[in-house]
Amino acid sequence: MELFLDTANVDEIREAAALGVISGVTTNPSLIAREGRDFTQVVREITGLVDGPVSAEVISTEAEAMVAEAEELSQIHPNVVIKIPMILEGLKAVSMLEPRGIRTNVTLVFSANQALLAALAGASFVSPFVGRLDDAGHDGMEVVRDTVDIFDLYELPTRVIAASIRHPLHVLAAAKAGAHIATVPYQVLMQMAGHPLTDVGLRKFLDDWARLKKR
């Protein structure tokens, strides 16, 4: 399973990229608005930090307008993937973009049925929102499992991105469910890297070495 970073903060992306563990980035209008910077400039800067897919979302809700936005965004860099909301107009847009060679990531997916429709329309990626489903009393990871099973059964090329990740256990569950990718916030990536016993063990090694040096 691959890891993407779910952020529009270039400092976080730069630090995560230096670890050598992320292979892409996902953004959305809320994340970019939080940065208070020009949308196009942020996306362009991100593509210079990671050598992999960078998802940038359209704002329009009508197919033709989504396609126009997608064509403009795709000119920023070949790695830009267009995030399209899982609505009927979004499916139309995906089916129009796929023959043009513009990759899409269908977002706001909350059921395996939605994921299947997105894949049949030609989506490159689908993003089931695990955390939001859990918040609503559903089993978000079950949607990931069902989607992966369906895509595998029918050999659909669409890749599954486990999204709306809230904690490291979500990442572990996504990996066990067969998700191709989990897109994680920066703080979750940091939590994945840490463990109290690692810190205790390192301190002991260093203390033992320091005592040896004093002899």
UniProtKB/Swiss-Prot annotation:
Reaction equations catalysed: D-sedoheptulose 7-phosphate + D-glyceraldehyde 3-phosphate = D-erythrose 4-phosphate + beta-D-fructose 6-phosphate
Record flagged with keyword Transferase: yes
Active site: K83
Signal peptide residue numbers: none
Entry-linked InterPro entries: Aldolase_TIM, TAL/FSA, Transaldolase_3B, Transaldolase_3B/F6P_aldolase, Transaldolase_AS, TSA/FSA_arc/bac
GO molecular function: aldehyde-lyase activity; transaldolase activity
Broadest EC class assigned to this enzyme: transferase
Keywords: Cytoplasm, Pentose shunt, Schiff base, Transferase
Function: Transaldolase is important for the balance of metabolites in the pentose-phosphate pathway.
Name the UniProt record assigns to this protein: Probable transaldolase
